[in-house]
C-alpha cells in the first residue's frame, strides 16, 4: 500500500527501509515483482535490507554499510560472485533461500493443549486439539501472513479474552491468569514492551531474584554490553530486538514466546540469537517461535 501511494504521488525516487521484514515468502515474491515494475518505469529505488535474496534479480549496485560508514560498493555482477562464506563474514544473509528439513511433532509432553479455539469471523476460526509439547524443546509456528500465528501465541499466553482453552502443565489445568504469570513474550514490535529509561533497569523490571552477572553475560553475548546505560528507545531497530530477547532471557518463566525474533537482524546477530535460544532451552523451558 505504501509503495502504491509513493508511485501514485509521482515520485522519481523511492526509499525503503527493510520492506520485507514482516512479510512471508509469497508476499516477498509480490514485493520483488513490484520493485521490478517500478524499475522498468524509470523509478530509482533505494532499499536498506538484511534479507537480500529477493533483490538479486533487481539490484544494480550494492553499498555495504558498516558502523555508519560506507565500507564497499559492488556492481551487481561483483556481488553475485560472493559465496556464502564471504557473505556471512560480512554479516550478510545468503543470496538464496535454504530448505529446512524439520521432524514432525512427536506425541507426549508436559504442556498439553486439550482444546483451543478463537473466532476471527463467523467463517474463520483458529482451532487446536490434543497437542503436547516437551520441556527443553523449541517449537516453530509457521504460516502465511494473517493466518493466526501471533493470535495463537496470544491465546497460549492468556492475552486473548475471547479465546477458549483447556491447557494443562504437568497434569494441572492452567487458567489465563496462571499462563500469563508464567509466560514471557518478545513481540513483533518491541517498542510496545520497553518501559524504563535505562537498558539495565529494563532487564530488572518484574524479575524476582535478579541475577546481575547473568544479565551482563547475556548482554555481552548479544553485543549489547556497551549500551548498558543507554535509554532503550535510543537503540536501533535490530538492537531493540536483541535487547527484548535479552530481557526475556533474564526471566524465569517456563513458557517463552518469540514473535518474529529475527526481524531487523543481520546474519551474525541471527547466529548469536540462535545459539542463545538453543542454550536457553535446556533451562526447563518450552520455547515457541
Predicted regions and their residues:
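Conserved ABC ATPase "signature" region
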Residues: 212-227
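Catalytic Walker B motif of ABC-type/P-loop ATPase nucleotide-binding domains
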Residues: 14-17, 256-259
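Conserved beta-strand-loop-alpha-helix hinge in the C-terminal portion
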Residues: 69-91
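Conserved ABC ATPase signature
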Residues: 231-235, 239
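The feature captures the beta-strand-to-loop junction immediately N-terminal to the Walker
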Residues: 142-144
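Helix-to-loop junction immediately C-terminal to a conserved catalytic motif
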Residues: 157
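H-loop/switch region of ABC-family ATPase nucleotide-binding domains
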Residues: 49-50
Amino acid at each position: 500500500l505504501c509503495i502504491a501511494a509513493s508511485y501514485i504521488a509521482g515520485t522519481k525516487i523511492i526509499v525503503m527501509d527493510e520492506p520485507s521484514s514482516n512479510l512471508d515468502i509469497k508476499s516477498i515474491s509480490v514485493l520483488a515483482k513490484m520493485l521490478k515494475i517500478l524499475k522498468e518505469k524509470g523509478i530509482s529505488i533505494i532499499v536498506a535490507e538484511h534479507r537480500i535474496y529477493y533483490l538479486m534479480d533487481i539490484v544494480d549496485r550494492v553499498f555495504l554499510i558498516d558502523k555508519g560508514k560506507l565500507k564497499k560498493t559492488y556492481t551487481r555482477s561483483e556481488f553475485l560472485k560472493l559465496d556464502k562464506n564471504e557473505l556471512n563474514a560480512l554479516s550478510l544473509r545468503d543470496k538464496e533461500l535454504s530448505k529446512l528439513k524439520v521432524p514432525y511433532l512427536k506425541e507426549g509432553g508436559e504442556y498439553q493443549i486439550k482444546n483451543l479455539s478463537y473466532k476471527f469471523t463467523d467463517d474463520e476460526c483458529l482451532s487446536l486439539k490434543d497437542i503436547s509439547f516437551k520441556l527443553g524443546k523449541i517449537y516453530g509456528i509457521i504460516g502465511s501472513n494473517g493466518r493466526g500465528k501471533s493470535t495463537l501465541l496470544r491465546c497460549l499466553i492468556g492475552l486473548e479474552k475471547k479465546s477458549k482453552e483447556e491447557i494443562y502443565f504437568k497434569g494441572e489445568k492452567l487458567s489465563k491468569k496462571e499462563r500469563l504469570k508464567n509466560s514471557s513474550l518478545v513481540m513483533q514490535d518491541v517498542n510496545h514492551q520497553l518501559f524504563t529509561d535505562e537498558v539495565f533497569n529494563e532487564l530488572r523490571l518484574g524479575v524476582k531474584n535478579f541475577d546481575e552477572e547473568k544479565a551482563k553475560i547475556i548482554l555481552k553475548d548479544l553485543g549489547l554490553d556497551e549500551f548498558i546505560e543507554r535509554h532503550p528507545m535510543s537503540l536501533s531497530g535490530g538492537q531493540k530486538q536483541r535487547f527484548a530477547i535479552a530481557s526475556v532471557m533474564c526471566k524465569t518463566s517456563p513458557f517463552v514466546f518469540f514473535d518474529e525474533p529475527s526481524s531487523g537482524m543481520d546474519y551474525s546477530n541471527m547466529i548469536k540469537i540462535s545459539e542463545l535460544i538453543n542454550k536457553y532451552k535446556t533451562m526447563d523451558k518450552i520455547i515457541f517461535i
